[in-house]
From Swiss-Prot:
Pfam families: Toxin_cobra-type (PF21947). It is found in: Secreted. Disulfide bonds join 24-45, 39-63, 67-75, 76-81. This is Short neurotoxin homolog. Residues 1-21 form the signal peptide. The keyword Transferase does not apply.
Amino acid sequence: MKTLLLTLVVVTIVCLDLGYTIICRTRDTYQIPITFTNCEEGHVCYKYSTTETPNRILIHRGCAAKCPKRLRVICCSTDKCNK
């Protein structure tokens, strides 16, 4: 019985994946190749845009502890969600 209980505890810990960090895209619009990073300081991926010139919009991507306070930030909390 103790062995079964210990097995269930181990399986639960493995399935819950304690210490999970989210993976976010960190590439800006004009950077190649696409890069990903483990977001260790937080659990939010973000994407927002800025206008460099009237004809060029730059999209910024990254990860943060909480959603940045900007007017048009899109935040999400699943892996690679900030396309």
